[in-house]
């Protein structure tokens, strides 16, 4: 019965296929193999899309949608793009999260019976980009696979991640708890995520294009074996991945998919890195966002820490900088080695100094991505010429590094890495023309002298010019037609052109080839014989050149690992040189590390803000076991958030390996950096501003350790005054008593400044400001002790709030202050007994009136003795006395 059903189904399919033309049958077969992908079907000089693909491409790419004929009774909708411009259209599709299958003609139209043979040679997806035209120079593109592991009860117990930078061949694995997935994806920022049907729901929204793959691709045992085969090892023990489970399953699915899109092996994926959470300083999504490491809060690329630090001379260095900023190592050993290398670069002699080194680095090509294309056999001629020129420049670069490497072990390691693979430079020099064409099909790629057969064929083609000149001279003399011309075009080949008024002089052996409005074009037996010989030589030369070029690519494959080593060394050298340039230009210093708990920053500056203003006020920051929490008060716009962020950024920069913007800095161990700064709601997630604030606070309270650095800015402001005050008080107490972490706690709740009385490990500092006339001057200096007011009305006035509103607010503020003075001190500790307020005795005689100190000071001075400067100083003094009152002056 089953056999009958299968037979009838096949017959029905055959009948349906017969209704289409042979070419459409070929297209539909290819399309059935790529149902969710736009198929770019090569037809001559164009890539055509049909049916639904054509409609979608026309909409996304702004193409003209046409309709030509019908197949099986259905109108054929078409849209096409020129083959030479396909990359720019692919780039647009990738930005929309779409994928495209590139279907090329692989058969010879002259010998094909029926449609020319075609096949899909590659699939371009958001996560598998390698072509330079599709990639951003300064950021990596990651393809990530996600595999959920379950316990015996069927509950998700861990999540395995495998992500690949196909352009470089870097493969990484990690296993983590389910609640850590969002933070990991935020850090990796994959362009495309592979997941099985049952796990797609685990992926947070907006994290990249999601591609469904069969669940069996994630089999753990198969994934482990596939990894071993890819890395050409018997066991993964050497990579620390043998004990992994779900991560190996994810890696298996990743490798299957990546190889399928490229249509070949991934020869450049020869190493593996297993990421461990304890290896790096933890930075959650909120911290990365609030510190503006690589993207501002407005979503722009500048001004950020990355944009400030990125003075790299190569794209490889810029990409490595982005990776280092998001992966600061916890161990200070790596940072110290980088600091040592920066110091050696700064102290180098002029002939091998920083400027000379960076000048040489500017001539270096993107070896990392060229190597990736080499491994995938998709490198273009100018990739190879750039690689050749880079390898030719390496000996001089190595000499410069060697002269200063004795003072830094890291530079010695890099100097050794910059040796080109043996024989690689010689092959590229002999094989590739000095200035090759962009594409092999254009010819002129293989250097003369590399292949005798190619040189002979080229000689035939290149001697055409002289033959045509000689023929033209002879024919003018023979026919008496002085303006006769012998020319060539790609459509009609070689021809003799005669103007219409001279056609009566044409000899009998001239055969008409083309008629124009004002001329006739002819061919002669002699010219036809030469044409056959010349065009045949040209075609054979191009075919020979294509074969030779493919041979060069194959010959370079054994050198892939050596090229990757060179690329890695160049990227790190470039980044260290950029760090040295920043340190010299911006007056940064090398930080120190200690095993003792503490953060000490002398005259620290915010690196990004300092670059945006004319003058920046430097400030100190000291945190240690006796001073774990700083309560920061002061006016709005006074610099509280800047001070907090600069402390975190200086710490981060130190562990990344950069010098830091300070007079001196010293750091103990840091395991994580948390920030709770700013206010923003999450409308898509259904969370209010206050809910977002409390969620971030909860993460800090649950995860911060004594080695964590915590920034808390105005916690509790998203709710009512007393609720917010109570929460802020309780959170600060918990950070001191339970987490015992380094904490910078900015607040406008001045009641919190009483906290140091209960916890000696807390201290008050404030950002100072002075009133000047009807305005306010922010001093941006951090001083010990609490602030005495917030200057909110003055800031509102600076912001342009209308004067009537300011006057009304000032009047209401006076009323509130009078009310507050008449009430008891608020009960801050929710579990303490209410404070006892002593009532004044009514029968006591009133105290004698005390003259106001400002008045006394005025009576003491002689106005005629005051100089202008003294008068200004006195004005400020009187202003302070007037605000303090008699009682304060006496204290």
UniProtKB/Swiss-Prot annotation:
The keyword DNA damage applies. Pfam families: MutS_I, MutS_II, MutS_III, MutS_IV, MutS_V. GO terms for molecular function: ATP binding; ATP-dependent DNA damage sensor activity; damaged DNA binding; mismatched DNA binding. The keyword Nucleus does not apply. GO terms for cellular component: cytosol. One of its GO terms (biological process) is mismatch repair. Transmembrane segments: none annotated. InterPro entries: DNA_mismatch_repair_MutS, DNA_mismatch_repair_MutS-lik_N, DNA_mismatch_repair_MutS/MSH, DNA_mismatch_repair_MutS_C, DNA_mismatch_repair_MutS_clamp, DNA_mismatch_repair_MutS_core, DNA_mismatch_repair_MutS_N, DNA_mismatch_repair_MutS_sf. Keywords: ATP-binding, DNA damage, DNA repair, DNA-binding, Nucleotide-binding. ATP binds at residues 634-641. This protein is involved in the repair of mismatches in DNA. It is possible that it carries out the mismatch recognition step. This protein has a weak ATPase activity. Belongs to the DNA mismatch repair MutS family. This is DNA mismatch repair protein MutS. The gene is mutS.
